[in-house]
Amino acid sequence: MSWIVKLGKKGKKIVKKIITPAEKHYVGYTRRIERVKTGERICAMTFDDGPMGLPASPDRFEGKTLTDVLLDTLAQYGAKGSFDVIGDTSENYPDEAGKLGSAAWGGVKFDHYPDIHCDDKGGAVHNDRLIRRMLDEGHQITNHGYRHIIFGKKPFVYGAREYLPGFDAAVADLTRLDTLMRERYGYTLTLARPPHYVDKMAGGFTSYDVYERMGYQYMAASFDGAGWLPSTHEDPEAALQAEIDAMVEPMRKALEKDPDFFCGQIIFQKDGYNMAKRTPVAFALGKQLELLKEYGYRVVSVGELMEESPFTDVGRDDPLFEKLVALAKTRAIVFTDNKLRLDDKMTVGELAMLLAPHDEAISRRVAQLRKTGKAGPYDGAMSYCRENGLIDASTKAEDAVTKLPDAMFDKAIDFTRRNVYAAYKMEE
């Protein structure tokens, strides 16, 4: 395992814990989905950075591409996946390979998939057959960026990396892949994951702003399948076996300790080389799926998992569930960590997000960020609601709600989020 990656991740955790204030979640149209609430033994798997048009490494599958090997394995177990694909990294030059085993193994300034100078073997642009196979076999495709360029600075591990200059560039990059999938395959993308989970961008924007503009949800993960980290063994066979074990044993131990551990979870996987240019996922995926099968799990796409429940803290047993699901399709009611927090008091900012139209809330916030470089998460919605008399002009976003517009609500028992949403009159 690369010590610099380990050190970077550990350092980031320390900084977050000691120096950085706790992340403040807010109600928005886009939320980060790591898992959902369910008592059913159902979980999802995601596969980043493909499709890969090169064989597994080592190749013990008669020259089949890695993506074909993964699709064959999923089919064997009746499982479905969410393939978080890229478009094409062939524009990511000039560049050079970094040290094998490091985070820069495939490129110092940019990522290259499946490898530097092999860009024509990776991504949706160059792998029409693999994309069509994914779709024909019922898998989901999600947007991991056309060129897989990080959205902003990431000094701990990717300090030398080029990054997108801002909001417009990120929207343009995602739109290229979105358009490709729509025009070539008639497929609508609904989920996305930012390259290397970099969220903060220039100008005060974040990945959430970009995804709100695109109409996406943020697909994260709650369990790391571990296939991307290299072993330190010098012997190639020992290294491969160690990497396979690192993918299988944590899953085995988690299930032995709690058979319901993976209920509603999203498992991260890699559709490509790890940092040592091996593909342990080709050998470990079947072992993982066998384990999950033994414990009675169904492995589905993230989209299907969200049909079970789209929320982290509210499931089908909640009496308000169906209304909340319907509301969340057109209104901002869920926090960015995918929780509803129904029993807490609602604030005026959260009420404004419920009442303001999607385009108004987003466009006004974006305009304010362009103008000043600063904007609160509710500023766009607050601006609209003040102009239209839906909230008092003197109230602040953090104030508690004390009254509701009569025309839009039945009488509420109190102003918890649960009762406000229950009282809201759904549009016909």
What are these regions (language model features)?
Residues S90-E91, I150-F151, V198, G227-W228, ...:
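Short secondary-structure capping/turn micro-motifs that flank functional sites
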Residues D119, G123-N127, R133, Y146-K293, ...:
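Catalytic domains of cell-wall/extracellular-matrix polysaccharide-remodeling enzymes
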Residues I42, T65-V69, H126-R129, P165, ...:
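Extracytoplasmic/secreted proteins, especially bacterial periplasmic and envelope-associated proteins
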Residues P94-A97, K154-V157, P230-D235, M346-G349, ...:
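Short secondary-structure transition/capping segments
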Residues A75-A79, L135-D136, T175, T179-G186, ...:
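Sec-exported extracytoplasmic/periplasmic mature domains
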Residues E308-E428:
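N-terminal propeptides
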Residues W3, G8-G159, P165-L189, P194, ...:
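Active-site beta->alpha N-cap acidic-glycine motif
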Residues D48-G50, I86, P195-Y197, K270-N274, ...:
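Short strand-loop junctions, especially beta-strand C-caps/beta-turns
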